[in-house]
Structures are given as structure tokens and as C-alpha cells.
Amino acid sequence: MAKVIGIDLGTTNSCVAIMDGSQPRVIENSEGARTTPSIVAYTDNERLVGQPAKRQAVTNPTNTVFAVKRLIGRRTTDAEVEKDKKLVPYNIVDGGNGDAWVEVRGEKFSPAQVSAVILQKMKETAESYLGETVTQAVITVPAYFNDAQRQATKDAGKIAGLEVLRIINEPTAAALAYGLDKKDSKTIAVYDLGGGTFDISVLEIDDGLFEVKSTNGDTFLGGEDFDMRIVNYLADEFKKEHGVDLTKDKMALQRLKEAAEKAKIELSSASQTEINQPFISMNAATGVPLHMVMKLTRAKLESLVDDLIKASLKPCAAALKDAGVSKDEIDEVVLVGGMTRMPRVVEEVTKFFGKEPHKGVNPDEVVALGAAIQAGVLQGDVKDVVLLDVTPLSLGIETLGGVFTRLIDRNTTIPTKKSQIFSTAEDNQNAVTIRVFQGEREMAADNKMLGMFNLENIPPAPRGVPQIEVTFDIDANGIVSVKAKDKGTGKEQQITIQASGGLSDDDIEKMIKDAEANAEADKKRKELVEAKNTGESLLHSTRKSLEEHGDKVDGSTVEMIELACNALEESLKSEDPGKIKGAVQNLTDAAMKLGEAIYKAQASEAGPASDDEDGPRSVDDDIVDADFEDMGENKRK
């Protein structure tokens, strides 16, 4: 049976591993390195990947694509993409569908295409070692990747000629590698600060069971940001001394980036390093070449990136809160990602959790090792390992009044499936629009819309009668599909959220922060909408009953009900949920006599009820009103 490989598709470096017997093993590439730079370069006559691409980046900056993982599944309008445009020497353009693509040598490539080139390199590395063709893989992604980013990663695998059996979260993969041979029960935190993304996951491990309790993160925080702080500092110092802005020169900027990365790595073990870049520019007036010779201390580096390190601690606090555990209950902190080699990062993590992190895993390789273990589980080579991951954000749909009705809460174990019955909001409504949202706010408009679709040709019926079953399905890859079915006709419509849309990391951060800051306001707004929905529904049904059965009660009762209806109608114009609820109760009480008269009349017409007859049932039971969009004849054609 052909091997299933595990791939860590990283922002800065990528790594491939396989199961070798009972243990995972990292495979060296053709250059003899255990990790491969996630860089692709396009020259006049060839395409370079990995170290060869990195070596020529200075002389070919506009055609050398790096950190493309930060663009995968993103839109050109995303704030992160706008930020990236100013930082990278290559061109980021609109792919024609709103997605962020790259342009090199006049040709456009999607981030999935560029990522596929890196995956192909990983595939070839494994094939060279195994001596056989590889067609299946497990690929890792940041835990906080949204649906679009996961879809795009899967697409990249497909382009690379790989069947992606599973998309697995990076911290979860790291936990698998850490806990494979451990039999005791532990609660661990995986702190994963990589080249472009940050994740924190809290897991419980117990003799082969790996259960993720919560996850949080930032998909635009990583080593690339640390490098840019050094680059900006070096450029500013050079400008002060020579009056030349190196950031305007793409070749000089690429040299600075390489120097910054090298200095950052050196300062993890040394207290000072020298940055020496001869002939980096020239004096425009005299033509004299200018050189950069500068010392950078560890203390200076720490001051430049202090806020970035601190920014990683906020998601840590959120993850602990969501998991319902205290810092003291964390038995082990596992560090993952190259940036965790920085002494200051280790210090801050130690201070936050109150304990020294575990240093028994290689932060650059542990994610690929975990992916290989998951591949072994899927292939049947690894026994007695059960992995339970979670979805990072709540999912639901917009219902009447713009309310966000959750079907799946954040940190729900996946795979998962949840259904709920909704109905129409108008009489004879023949179509409903299902709008799918992701987020934590109570009102749909405050969350991120992932997609929408229409369920049409609903048979004419009074409002509240049709039963529309909406089903959310999240697979083990964290990819979402939504289905709506008219239970009366059996007609259904389905959508899998496509990679052309998705969330930015700022959107996710904003959703949770806003949800906490505005929880009370959201609650009040939701309470008002729900009160109005209840009031309008009661008003409609009572007036309809009065019209059809008003002759079954005396005139004073009819008058009392009409007065209560008018009072409720007036209260619905207000923004006071208490007033509306009071009017609802008054009308309910007033209409009680009418209800009794209707049932008595029905009972006398039907005669004595037999034991096997069903009692009266309301079609409104457990039904939530759904918002809809009038499609119009032309739109539906």
C-alpha cells in the first residue's frame, strides 16, 4: 500500500514526514535539509523552489514569491492584503473574482497555485526517499484558518497531484507528535508562533485520546512581522545617516529582509550581531557607493517586537477562558514554530503560564511529524489514537429581524452536523434566502457572511406553515456545507462555502472582541427583535381567528380583543421590549375566550373524540421565522 505523507505547509518553511514503523520521520530534501523554504521563483526559463529560489531572491525580487500562505483564501479588499502589498517586492493583484493573486513576469497565479508548487516539492522529496509514487497526503493549516483558506489549501493539494485525505490544525498535529507515546492524562497548551501565523490550542491528552478543548489565534502574526520590524529599523537608521530611503529600492529591500532574518536567528543565541551589506545603494549626487554596517543587539530587537509578542498572549487568555481551565491546570506548555526559539518569546510564555515550556520537541518539525501520525491513523498503521478537533467560530443563519441564529457554537467538536426547522415569514411565500454567517455577535449584520443560496418553488401556504429544515455540516477538515430542505415537497438546495469568500484575521479578532464589548447591547437588540417577532405573529394569528370565528363569542369579547390588538400594534412601533411583552400578554389573555369558543365549536361538530385520534397540533411548534428575499421572476430564471 502506498504511503500517505504528512506535510507542514508553512509560511516561511515547509516540511514533509512519513510513518517509519511506529515512529514518524522527517524526510530530507534534495539539498539535504530537513525543511524547505516556502519560496517559489520564476526566471526567464525555469521555476525554482525552496533554497535555490531563496538564493536568487536578491537579484530577482519582483519574481520571487514568498509567504504566499498569507494570501491563500483572501480577498484583495482584506486589510491584511493591503498591508502585504506594501511589504513584499512582488505584485499582488485581483484574480478577477476578488481573490488576491500574485503577478510575476506578466502572468497571474493564485496563492493555491504557488502553494501547489511547494507541495509538489514536498511530494517529490517523499517519492525520492520512498522510491514510489505518492498520491495521498495530510496537510496542516493554522487552527484559526477560515473555511475559504482551508478550501484553498485543499485546492493547492489537488493542483499538486495529491488527494488531501485530511486538513489538520497545526497545534493539534504538534500535540499528536508530543503525546504519541504518553500514557498518562494531561492538559496541555500548544503555543504555535510560526513564520506568518499564530495559534494557541488547549488539549486534553489521555492514553491515545487527543481532545481539543478550545483554540484561538491570529492568522497575520508571525516571524514575517518580526522581520519587517527589523527591516524598517535598518531602513530608518540608514536614511538618517545617508538620506537614502532603501524601501523604495526592491532589490535593496530584499537584501534587508534577508539580513533581518539572519540577524533575528543569530540573536537567539548571541547578544549582539553585525549587519554588513556592502554597496546597498549609492549617493545620487556623487555616485559614491553606500554601505550598511550596523550593530543590532538582542535588547534592541526585543524592544522593536515587544508589542508583537504581547499580542500573542491575548488569544492565550481567550483560549484558556473558552476551555474553562486556569493557568495552574495546564500541565505542559508545548512550543511550536521557529519564532519560539527567540529567548524573549520563551520568557513571556513562561511568565504568562507560570511554568517553563516543554522543550523536548523540534519546533520546526513537530507539526509535520504530527501530520504523518494522522496519516498513519487514516492508513491504519497507527492504532489506538483518537483525535477530536474543534471549529474556531460559531456558525448560523440570519433569521427574521436580522437575528443571528446559531446552529453550531465555536469550539464544537468536529466533524459535526446540526439541523433546525425554520419557516416562512409571509403568506404564500414561494422562496427563502438562506444567508450563512460566521461569528459571535447576536445580530447577523455584525458577523461575517460566508455565503447565501435560495430555496425556491415552495408551495403557497400561510406564514409559519412550510417547514424548512436547515442543516449545517462541518467535516473533519473544518470545511462547511449548508443544506436547506422543504420537508413538504422534499426539494433541497445545498452550498459548500467557496474559497472566493472568507474571513480575514482582523474580522475574527473583531468578532470576538466586539461580542465581549457589546454583549449587553447585542442582548437588548436581540430581545427587542424577538419580542417584535412574537408580537407580530400573535397579532396576525389573532386577527385571522377573529375574522373567521368572531361570531362564536359575544360582542364585548370581540371588542376587548380588538382593543388588545390595537394596543399591541401600537407597542410594536416602540423600541421597548418590556412594553411589547406586556401587550403580548394582554392580547393572549384577551384572546383566551375566543380560543375556548373555537375548540368547543370544533368538539361539538366532530362529536366525541376516539382514543386513537391525535390532539390538536400547532404548525408553529419549534419553528423559527426565517428571513427571505423576493427573488422576482427575472432573478429566478
From Swiss-Prot:
UniProt cross-references to Gene3D superfamilies, sorted A to Z: 1.20.1270.10, 3.30.420.40, Actin, Chain A, domain 4, Substrate Binding Domain Of DNAk, Chain A, domain 1
Gene Ontology molecular function terms on file: ATP binding; ATP-dependent protein folding chaperone; unfolded protein binding
Pfam families linked to this entry: HSP70
Annotated positions of the Phosphothreonine modification: 197
InterPro entries for the chain: ATPase_NBD, Chaperone_DnaK, Heat_shock_70_CS, HSP70_C_sf, HSP70_peptide-bd_sf, Hsp_70_fam
UniProtKB keywords: ATP-binding, Chaperone, Nucleotide-binding, Phosphoprotein, Stress response
Ranges annotated as biased composition (Acidic residues): 621-631
TM region(s), chain numbering: none
Region annotated Disordered, chain positions: 531-552, 602-637
Induction, as annotated: By stress conditions e.g. heat shock.
Positions in coiled-coil regions: none
Source organism, top-level taxon: Bacteria
Function noted in UniProt: Acts as a chaperone.
HAMAP family: DnaK (MF_00332)
Similarity remark: Belongs to the heat shock protein 70 family.
Protein's UniProt name: Chaperone protein DnaK
Gene of this entry: dnaK
